[in-house]
Structures are given as structure tokens and as C-alpha cells.
Amino acid sequence: MITDRVSDYLEKIEKSDVNAFIDVNSEKVLKEAEELEKNDDLKNKPLYGKIVAVKSNINVKGYKISCASKTLEKYVGTYDATVVKKLRSQGALIVGMTNMDEFAGGSSGETSCYGPTKNPAALDRIPGGSSSGSAAAVAADLCDMAIGSDTGGSIRNPASHCGIVGFKPSYGVVSRQGLCDLAMSFDQIGPLTKNAEDALVLTNAIKGIDRSDSTSLETPKFEKKDISNYKVGVVKEFMDVTDEKIRNEIEKGIEVFKDMGCKIVDLSYKYIDLALPTYYLINYVEFFSATRKYDGRRYGEFIEEACGEEVLRRILIGKHISEQEFSGKYYKKALQARKSMKKEMLGLFNSADLIVGPTVPKLPHKLGEDLSPMEMYAYDVLTVPTNICGICSGVVRCGNISGVPVGLQIQGAPLEDEKVLSAMIEFEKNY
């Protein structure tokens, strides 16, 4: 019975101490489960009875959509985002809203006004961010699967740290309608799951064109493909910036592709040093623009007065470099760099079907450890190129270091999501 499974998960959530959830409405989800059991029209849908957690920056009617910020602490969603409507239409149940870095501005899960999320795979360490609660909920078996958002690695970073699967679809594959945006030209909604097969199913369920999002695209259903004859690229610069222990685990993962019949191709990406400055300059400007609606008049509090330190830092820098005298010096140059980075990245796919390598260059730090902003941003150096270039990218578990999970990142060209998801599935089977 679906209601029994929901009750089991609710009990686990109640007992859990990882702080994965911000808002859970037991009465609401149990009532929805009872109604679902009576709905014969949904019984053959691919997500029938699946219990899904949703990141707290995606609108779900009747739940707190706080973005883990005091700014929106009292805001309750008045509608379902397009992805949530799609989940429900496929037979899924929403169990609750997950913790996250405030306004998705972080890589650790520590900037939430509700306190940090713990990593279920290593309880004394960060789970990664910003989709910290979604990743932790899946890793701690508090739901079947979860939805997160990825602006510069916010699905893939915590998936790697928590030892689960995460997938960032190509830009436009999934509608962003109902997402509280961090940086609209980077943001993409995607799945966090216990295995790669589920990532394929969940991506198919939520993707598709949406009149409410002009950037959204229609794509054929993604199917599992044979990857045995694929050329798999390994970028030297991605490996060079990665800690040796992680690199060793990733090299073992690369051997798995070789054993599957793939040809390994050595590649070079000369713009790795531009990744963080390009990403963050554009991010700051777009985030500053996105937060102007939080003025304390229409809903919520005035953001500059209510937000945390990292969010305020991004707003103030974004405001500064948006000013006319600085725009040409910083923002326009970042846009030029983005164009060069994208051209170079897309060129790599002329030599390879996929690019594989590390997801994050270092292990997650211990909860409460004091890191400078630049040390924190360094977590993103291998994930932001995906968002800058609009390509797709997934993460699967690839070993561990003293029990702390390591994730292998698999990247594909724009709209080659099917290839990446297929490679994730085959890697998991053969690892």
C-alpha cells in the first residue's frame, strides 16, 4: 500500500537528525496517498506511488517556499511549479520541502537559516550544496527520489559528496517555471536519485516544453543506448586541479569505460582558469537582478535586511558590477569569456561522445570548519563549465576515500542527455 510506504518515510523523517527537510505536512501527503490509491488512471504511470522530496526554491502549493531564507520564511506556495505538476500527473507524491543553501547561493548546505544539513554518508561532513537537503534525503532513504536545481553544480556537488546519483539536464530540457531563480541563464531543475535508472525515469517525467518558460524545449523520450563504441574524453586540466586521492578513484572509473569497450581519448580545455571568475561575475549580476522582487512590499522581507552573509555578499557585488561604469570592465568581459568557453567546450565533443572526470576537486570539509569565500567557491571549478556552456552532466558514485563518497562526472554535448544517462546506467552496472 502506498499509504504504508508514506507512513514509513514520515516516521524515518521524524526520527532523522540530518536536517534534510524544512517543511513536511504528514496529514496532506497521507490524504494524497489515499486518493492516489483510488485513482486507476495513474496506476500505469512511471512514477506511480513514488515519494518525492522537492527543494525549497521550487513552488509546491501549500508548502513553505522559503529558499531557506528568513526573507521568505513565511511565504507559502500558492501554485505548483510545472515540474511539480508533471510529477503529480505521473503518479508521484510530494513528501515535503528540503533544506538548501540560502537562495541556492552556496556549495556546502551550511548557509540555510534552518541550520546546516548533515551528510548521511559522513555525518561530520557537509553534504554539499546548494541542493543539500534533496541529496541528504535520498542518501538517508527518507524518500524514493528528489528534485533539485543546479546553477553551477548544485545537484552534482551534493550527489558526489553523499554518494548518490544526480543529473543536470541540458539547458532548456526542463521548465524553470515556478523556480526561484539564482541566475536564470545557468539554472536548471533536475533529479537526485538512488540509482541511474531512476534518474532516467525521473528526467523523462519532468522534461518538456512549457509555454510559461520561453527557454524550454521539446525533446524525444530519452532511451537507454549502447555506449560500447563511444569515445570517452578525459580532460587533462580537470584531472590536474583535483586532489590526488580523488584522482586515483576517478582513474579506476575511467578503466571501467575501457573495459566496456569505449575508447579513451585525451583532451585539453584551456579555459579552466576562467571558469570560476566567469561564472561568479555573471551569477552575481543575474542574482542581483533576480532579488529585486524581494522588496518587502509584495511578500516576504526586504532581502538585504533579512538575508545571510553569503547572499548579501552576492547582492552587493552584483549591484556594484551592474553599475554602468563597471559593467564593461567586468560583466561584459565575463560574457565574452563565456562565449569563448562554450566554443572550446563544444569543440571537445567533435573528438568524444562524452567527457568523464571528477565532480569536485576535494573532499567535503567538516561541518563548522571555517572556509574563506574563495575556498568555498573552489568546490565548483569542475561543475560550473557545464552551466556556462549549457551542456548536460550527471554524477554516479565512483568509490570512496575513508568512507567519504567520490562521484564521477559524465558530461555530454547540448541535448545529448540520452548519451549521458545511458553512460551513467552502464557505469553503475559495470563498476
Curated annotation (Swiss-Prot):
The keyword Plastid is annotated on this UniProt entry: no
One Gene Ontology molecular-function label: glutaminyl-tRNA synthase (glutamine-hydrolyzing) activity
Pfam family, one: Amidase
Annotated Gene Ontology cellular component terms: glutamyl-tRNA(Gln) amidotransferase complex
GO annotation (BP), single: translation
Domain of life: Archaea
E.C. number(s) listed in UniProt: 6.3.5.7
UniProt keyword annotations, A-Z: ATP-binding, Ligase, Nucleotide-binding, Protein biosynthesis
Enzyme class: ligase
Reaction catalyzed: L-glutamyl-tRNA(Gln) + L-glutamine + ATP + H2O = L-glutaminyl-tRNA(Gln) + L-glutamate + ADP + phosphate + H(+)
SUPFAM superfamilies on file: Amidase signature (AS) enzymes (SSF75304)
Active site (record annotation): K55 (charge relay system), S130 (charge relay system), S154 (acyl-ester intermediate)
Role of this protein: Allows the formation of correctly charged Gln-tRNA(Gln) through the transamidation of misacylated Glu-tRNA(Gln) in organisms which lack glutaminyl-tRNA synthetase. The reaction takes place in the presence of glutamine and ATP through an activated gamma-phospho-Glu-tRNA(Gln).
Alphabetized HAMAP family for the sequence: GatA
Quaternary structure, from the entry: Heterotrimer of A, B and C subunits.
Similarity field: Belongs to the amidase family. GatA subfamily.
Protein name (database record): Glutamyl-tRNA(Gln) amidotransferase subunit A
Taxonomic path: Archaea, Methanobacteriati, Methanobacteriota, Methanomada group, Methanococci
